[in-house]
Amino acid sequence: MTLNLGIVGCGGMGFRHMEGISELMRYSDIARLEAICDLHESAAKHVADIAEKNNGYRPKIYTDFDSMIDESGIDVLDIVTDTKTHHSFAVKAMNKGIHVLTEKPMGVTLKACRQMKEV
């Protein structure tokens, strides 16, 4: 089974996470980078360009998070955004049955982290 992955956040860490996913894809068919999302379309396009070079196909680009989780068919979401957004992105994705991975810290408050754990 191949897991369809999505990345939200295309800054420096998002780029590095894409590189790591690309490396995984070179040696295994367990994952496929399916979608990339960033508020700044130019950042998402840049990461998608490199992903296409690395992987031989271009992931779908989104500038709207809700559209990505509704339309892309991802199984796993890699959240690589500003810490204050980890909670809201994670809860939305998990409520749709999407597994999540967040950069650390998981959330800005213990309450937010507990809410994420409960979903």
Predicted regions and their residues:
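Alpha-helical structural signal in soluble globular domains
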Residues: G20-L24, V47-I50, K92, K96, ...
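Beta-loop-alpha module in the N-terminal Rossmann-like domain of NAD(P)-dependent dehydrogenases
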Residues: N54, P59-K117
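N-terminal Rossmann-like dinucleotide-binding module
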Residues: M1-N54
